[in-house]
Amino acid sequence: MPKIKTLKSAAKRFKITASGKFKRKQANLRHILTKKTTTKKRHLRPKILVSTGDMDRVKSFLPYA
């Protein structure tokens, strides 16, 4: 049986934690930042965990993670 290929775009976007969950960067911090408040930008800065509804999909993208 052939090996399952890793989805490379997902491999660049998600990192696995020690407990097996995935963390990701939040959206809305790439451009048009002048109209966003400093507080809004600061709250978007930290990485957050992938929601439980999306975990199975992300795991299928990264079979060897």
Curated annotation (Swiss-Prot):
Family matches, as Pfam families: Ribosomal_L35p
Highest taxon listed in the record's lineage: Bacteria
Alphabetical GO biological process terms: translation
Keyword vocabulary terms for this entry: Ribonucleoprotein, Ribosomal protein
Any GO MF annotation of the entry: structural constituent of ribosome
Gene3D superfamilies noted in UniProt: 4.10.410.60
Any Gene Ontology CC annotation: cytosolic large ribosomal subunit
Disulfide bond positions: none
Membership in a protein family: Belongs to the bacterial ribosomal protein bL35 family.
NCBIfam families cross-referenced by the UniProt entry: rpmI_bact
Protein name in the entry: Large ribosomal subunit protein bL35
